[in-house]
């Protein structure tokens, strides 16, 4: 219990070395990699995500925390893939065309990975064909689109409409996120879910 709490604090403070050490200690104690991931890393990142959403933490701190989580993940990933833990889903994520902010989708990507989803991140300024090609190539079931500018938000609808035009909209769960968005907008563009700033 104590070390888990400590890990949450270290994650919150973005201390990558400490997170790597803590992760190793858990593994040495015989913890399953999935348990370390869930209890120490994902739980800790949820707190970071909540405080980011509530304006207590800002982008630089969140990036440090994400970086610290990566240090722990680096130790866990080889074990997880060797033990043949199948991803629960495959997701393609990217910031829409015209938008070059990637913090939100990076966070969502990390959270989803923490939850056992395999994530293919297309980066920023992604156009509709790139999204669709990636969905088909990776055999994904979830599409995540992020936009931080009100001017680029409508492009999400362009992507959804293109999926509809090709008759494949229903194959995917579509999640949209970003600062100016809300549930009403998600519904308007035809998405299934809206997640506020990766929270």
Language model regions located:
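Glycine-rich active-site/cofactor-binding loop and its immediate structural neighborhood
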Residues: 86-122
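Conserved, mostly hydrophobic/aromatic
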Residues: 19, 55, 101, 112, ...
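Short acidic-hydrophobic, aromatic-tinged amphipathic segments that line or gate anion-handling sites
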Residues: 193-198
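Short glycine-enriched loops at secondary-structure junctions
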Residues: 42, 96-99, 125, 180
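Amphipathic, non-transmembrane alpha-helical secondary structure
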Residues: 5, 17-20, 24, 70, ...
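Long amphipathic alpha-helical segments
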Residues: 1-83
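Alpha-helix N-cap/loop-to-helix initiation residues
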Residues: 58, 100-101, 152
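Cofactor-cradling patches in redox/metallo enzymes
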Residues: 108-115, 120-191
């Amino acid at each position: 219990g104590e070390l888990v709490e400590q890990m949450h604090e270290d994650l919150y403070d973005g201390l990558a070395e400490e997170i790597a050490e803590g992760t190793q200690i858990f593994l040495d104690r015989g913890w399953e990699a999935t348990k370390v991931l869930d209890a120490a890393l994902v739980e800790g990142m949820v707190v970071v995500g909540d405080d980011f959403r509530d304006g207590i933490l800002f982008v630089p701190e969140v990036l440090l925390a994400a970086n610290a989580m990566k240090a722990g993940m680096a130790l866990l990933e080889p074990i997880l893939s060797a033990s043949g833990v199948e991803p629960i889903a495959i997701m393609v994520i990217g910031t829409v065309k015209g938008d070059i902010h990637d913090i939100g989708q990076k966070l969502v990507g990390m959270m989803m990975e923490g939850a056992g989803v395999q994530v293919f991140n297309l980066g920023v300024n992604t156009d509709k064909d790139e999204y669709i090609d990636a969905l088909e190539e990776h055999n994904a079931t979830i599409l995540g689109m992020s936009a931080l500018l009100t001017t680029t938000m409508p492009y999400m609808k362009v992507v959804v409409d293109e999926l509809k035009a090709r008759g494949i909209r229903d194959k995917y769960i579509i999640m949209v996120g970003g600062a100016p968005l809300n549930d009403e907008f998600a519904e308007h563009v035809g998405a299934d879910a809206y997640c506020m700033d990766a929270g």
